[in-house]
Amino acid sequence: MLSYLSGTLIEKFSTEIVVEVNGVGYLLNISATTHEKLPAIGNQIKILTYLYVREDALQLYGFITTEDREVFKLLIAISGVGPKLAQTILSGMSTAQLRESVIAGDTKALTAIAGVGKKTAERIILELKDKLVKLDLKIDIKETAFRSDKQQVRNDAYSALISLGFTKSIAEKAMRAAIAEVPDGSVDDLIRVALRHVQS
């Protein structure tokens, strides 16, 4: 199962994008919310994916955030809500707005979206209310773990600079510059950039 694609954004339209990975172009369906978060054509992109399997076709859906993908999966599990309507819903409101509407039981906000009738809105609220609360906790745990891993990488890079003989003030200044330049860099990336700033 594809979890994500990392490559070059070749084309982007209102509901579709093409990402090239190792010479292969992947067509992904996206929501308007995802479209707003895309980089410019030609830039590198890491996009989360969901493969929807039908009898006559395989369709890839793309998401910038874990939350968007998880909510999409919850939506298509509801009877009467297919991937097309799920994307329409995620285009009409953010996942945060959807969560607020569902928890508040606000059918009016949901029926304001094209294709969502009163019965569908009521079904969405009934089936998602508890699941969205649990999803929040699940995502918070994942993001906390990610932040912890990132902090450990930064701590290791800082310790390496100290072991190389740099003072704390110089190491801290170099690390701030390195983090600003490569916020998601590995230990080696951070050390390399930090050393460049120290030597400049």
Swiss-Prot record:
UniProt record similarity statement: Belongs to the RuvA family.
Protein name, per record: Holliday junction branch migration complex subunit RuvA
Keyword tags: Cytoplasm, DNA damage, DNA recombination, DNA repair, DNA-binding
Gene: ruvA
Domain text: Has three domains with a flexible linker between the domains II and III and assumes an 'L' shape. Domain III is highly mobile and contacts RuvB.
Region (Domain I): 1-64
Chief location bin: cytoplasm
Start and end residues of each stretch annotated as Flexible linker: 144-148
